[in-house]
Regions:
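Active-site acidic/histidine proton-transfer and metal-coordination neighborhood
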Residues: 17-24, 57-60, 78-182
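Glycine-rich, proline-tolerant flexible connector loops at the mouths of alpha/beta enzymes
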Residues: 35-55, 112-119
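Histidine-acidic metal/acid-base catalytic patches
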Residues: 1-32, 140, 166-185, 189-287
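A short acidic, helix-capping loop that chelates divalent metal ions and anchors anionic groups
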Residues: 40, 74-80, 116-121, 192-193, ...
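Active-site-proximal loop/turn and secondary-structure-junction residues that shape catalytic pockets
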Residues: 9-11, 38-40, 71-74, 114-116, ...
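N-terminal small/glycine-rich loop or linker at the start of catalytic domains
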Residues: 1-9, 67-78, 114-122
Length: 287
């Protein structure tokens, strides 16, 4: 299976490492690919020429660029009732799709919306019904471009107080006729609600990409500190996940995302040693 590393653990949230350095690092670790992040590693105003250079360099190093992520949507939502902000999020997504096409990326991570951002009180609280309707409308706006440029829109299950269960996700995704719209499934983000293998079993071919990470429960649920700094420690049953992935003939990316919130308030990224250890542990999974 294709195994990759998300940029943030290696390069941080402000783009401290270049795409070329990240490619070199992944190649040295024996990975199949990397996941660039737009807004830090990859600037939103990057040119087609620079994207082609990066893609060519990755090809020489035999490093895939199958997925791409962003943290943009936490501050600018596709589901906000604020029309100006929503338009800004839609326009960002169009640029994001174009960058993916230039780089040869097949799948981008999109956060469909949020009823509340629990760690940011400055963000508005929006009703579940409105998030459903506005996010659907926004995704419909960008889907034609995604189809034209052959880029998948993978909506991630995050702590956005929206779409908690596998069946909610199925109902939501079934609204979209396009095969370009699916889920970017995070194995750890769902653990306070349901087992990850249950989502995969129900969503099947709608699973377009996977974030590999872990979560440790506390007090019958858990908070941000449940996201530790050891990929192999936590609630995720990787053997069960692999079994269900094989049952649906999953061929997408398996990308380790390591943001060790358990270290708060002393979390520091980038952490190259943690990135290296995470790569080695990822390689022991999904054999």
């Amino acid at each position: 299976m294709y195994k990759a590393l998300n940029y943030w653990v290696y390069g941080g949230f402000t783009g401290e490492k270049t795409p070329y350095e990240f490619i070199d690092f992944a190649a040295a670790q024996g990975l199949d690919g990397v996941e660039f992040t737009v807004g830090d590693c990859i600037k939103i105003d990057i040119t087609e020429e620079e994207c082609k250079k990066i893609a060519a360099y990755a090809a020489v190093k035999k490093i895939g660029l199958r997925t791409m992520a962003t943290g943009f949507y936490w501050g600018c939502s596709l589901s906000t009732p604020d029309e100006a902000e929503r338009s800004q999020a839609v326009e960002f997504t169009r640029k994001y799709i174009q960058i993916a096409n230039w780089l040869g990326v097949e799948t981008i991570l999109v956060i469909p919306g949020d009823t509340r951002v629990p760690w940011d009180e400055s963000r508005p609280v929006v009703s579940y019904k409105d998030v459903w309707e506005y996010s659907k409308r926004s995704i419909d706006e960008v889907t034609p471009l995604a189809e034209e440029l052959n880029v998948n829109l993978a909506l991630e299950n995050v702590w956005n107080r929206f779409l908690f269960s596998p069946m909610e996700w199925k109902l939501y995704l079934d609204q979209f006729a396009s095969e370009k719209v699916g889920i970017y499934f995070d194995l750890a983000n769902c653990c306070i609600y349901c087992r990850p293998q249950d989502y995969i079993e129900i969503l099947k071919e709608r699973v377009l990409a996977i974030h590999v990470k872990n979560f440790s429960e506390s007090d019958c649920a858990g908070g941000l500190h449940g996201f530790g700094d050891d990929l192999l420690e936590g609630m995720v049953d990787f053997d069960a996940v692999q079994k269900v992935l094989e049952s649906i003939n999953y061929k997408g990316a398996l990308t380790a995302e390591m943001v060790p919130f358990s270290r708060l308030p002393d979390m520091v990224l980038p952490d190259e040693e943690l990135a290296r250890v995470t790569c080695q542990k990822l390689k022991t999974l999904f054999l």
